[in-house]
């Protein structure tokens, strides 16, 4: 289950990657896949925690 969610989170990140890359390049920062990898790992960790928080909140609202 967690692996499936991580893949979903990565798909979301990849959806917005071109926009992020454009904004960074406007600021003079080049973005490569090697440079982005640690941030993608951080993103999936944050998204997993946010997902669990939302899941917990939804569960407590239905009780």
Swiss-Prot record:
Superkingdom in the source lineage: Bacteria
The keyword Transcription regulation appears for this protein: yes
Keyword check for Cell division: no
Sorted UniProt keywords: Competence, Repressor, Transcription, Transcription regulation
BP GO terms, sorted: establishment of competence for transformation
Any Pfam family matching the protein: ComZ
Role according to the record: Negatively regulates the transcription of the comG operon.
The name this protein goes by in its record: ComG operon repressor
Gene: comZ
